[in-house]
Every structure is written in C-alpha cells, then in structure tokens.
Amino acid sequence: MELKNELCTVLEQIKEKTPLVHHITNYVTVNDCANITLAIGGSPVMADDHKEVEDMVSIASAVVLNIGTLNERTIESFVLAGKKANELNIPVILDPVGAGATAFRSQTIEKILKEVKLSVLRGNMSEIKNIYGTGTQTKGVDSVDSSLDGGKEIAISLAKKLSCTVVITGEVDIVSDGNKTYAIQNGHKALSSITGTGCMSASLIGACCGTGKGILQGAILGTMIMGIAGEKANERLKVHEGLGSFKVYLMDAVSNFDQDDIRKRGKVDEI
C-alpha cells in the first residue's frame, strides 16, 4: 500500500507540473511517443539536431533516448543530450531498441553507456540480456527470448553495474534499482502486436521520472500505466474491432488514467 501511495503522488505531480520530456527517438513511433506523453499529462519535445539538443535539455524535466532508427547524426545528439542532462541532474532514460541486432547498434549502446550516466534502462528480455552480456540473439527489434528465468538476477546485477534502474518488459515486467526489485503483472498480449508500445513506455517513464519524486517509483509507474492501459483497451474491444481500435483505446486509457487505476488495478509486488 505504501508503494501505491508513492505512485499516486507521482501521478499527481505529473498533472501539476506537466514535465517537459525531451525525446531523441526514432521516426517510426515519434508521433505515438509525443501523444502518449501528452495523454498522461506531460509535455513532449522531439528535437534531435546536435546544434540545439543541449539547449533543449536545459529546459527539460527528463530525457528519453531511443535508438530505434540509428544514424550518425543522432548518435552525436544522444551523447550531447545525455551529458548535458547529467550535468543538470536531469533523469536520462535509454531504450536500447534492437540491442544486439547489428554491430553498429551494439557499438552505439556501448558508447552511450560509457559517456552518459543513465537513470533508467528499459528494454525487453533479449535487449537487456544482450547488454548484460549473455549473448542472447536479437532478431530485428523483436524479442526472441521471452523466458523470465533469471530475469530478476539480471535486472539486479545490471542495475548495480550501471548504477541505474533497470526495467525488463515482458509477460511479467521486472523493475530493479539493485536494492529493491518489483514484478508488475499488468498488461495484455495485444500490446506486443502494435508498433511502439515499448517506445511509449519509455516516454511514460520519462514523464513519471520528470516529477522528481523518485526514479524507481517513476519506472514502476510508467511501466504499470502501459500495462493497465492495455488491459482496459482490450476490455473495450467489440467483436468486430481489432488492433486499430485497440491502439485508439490504449491512448484513451492513458489519458483517463487516475489514482483508482493504481490502487484497484495495479499488480505490483516486491520480489
């Protein structure tokens, strides 16, 4: 109950503060990320040119780095934005999309981890395992290893190694800061059938962490919001409706998300 009270405080602060979440993200889901940030009560900005990212970070509440569509230009921007955020004590969330799929992708992640202090690392099991160093194969940007065996240990170990909070998303989401570890059992399988739910989760985490009410709490709440919204979206579907309607209902559920959702529907336990 104490954790849920803390999560409710974070949600309340999003509504009061409207945190500015600076994204340097991919062009596949950029619109979804902007809209989900607005839906939860934050304010998105998607500037990615190296000539302005430091200025933009200076007025932001959180920074989300997403490597989905990599190029040399944005790699420079990732590092500049991350370093500026570190300098100003602004949370940095990294979404290592497709980690391990290519050497270029792996080298980029290594560069970011070397030069930027993360607040949150959010990925699916194969992405996190790849960064951890267990050599799990990644095919495209989809996880090919959905097993949660050892997930808790990997999350704790990587969180300690990187001195950040690690979020592993899957059938059961795992969130750890190295000291405390939680399992979140919200969500619906349809979330994996539309593009961008992982990217949008990182945006939600950014908005939550941007309140200044705790990185671990922000990571838990951002992850939980997506899971509960997925459940509520599925419940609204009529027989003839499919993934298009699901995505619309998902956005509706986030925009209507309130403290009752946390208290009555949140399935989070320390493990």
Swiss-Prot record:
Its EC number is 2.7.1.50. Keywords: ATP-binding, Kinase, Magnesium, Metal-binding, Nucleotide-binding, Thiamine biosynthesis, Transferase. Pfam families: HK. Pathway: Cofactor biosynthesis; thiamine diphosphate biosynthesis; 4-methyl-5-(2-phosphoethyl)-thiazole from 5-(2-hydroxyethyl)-4-methylthiazole: step 1/1. ATP binds at residues 122, 169. Catalyzes the phosphorylation of the hydroxyl group of 4-methyl-5-beta-hydroxyethylthiazole (THZ). Its cofactor is Mg(2+). The keyword Lipid metabolism does not apply. InterPro entries: Hyethyz_kinase (IPR000417), Ribokinase-like (IPR029056). This is Hydroxyethylthiazole kinase. HAMAP family: Thz_kinase. SUPFAM superfamilies: Ribokinase-like (SSF53613). It comes from Alkaliphilus oremlandii (strain OhILAs). It is an enzyme of class 2 (transferase). The keyword Ion transport does not apply. Coiled coil: none annotated. GO terms for biological process: thiamine biosynthetic process; thiamine diphosphate biosynthetic process. It catalyses: 5-(2-hydroxyethyl)-4-methylthiazole + ATP = 4-methyl-5-(2-phosphooxyethyl)-thiazole + ADP + H(+). Substrate binds at residues 46, 196. GO terms for molecular function: ATP binding; hydroxyethylthiazole kinase activity; magnesium ion binding. CDD domains: THZ_kinase (cd01170). Belongs to the Thz kinase family.
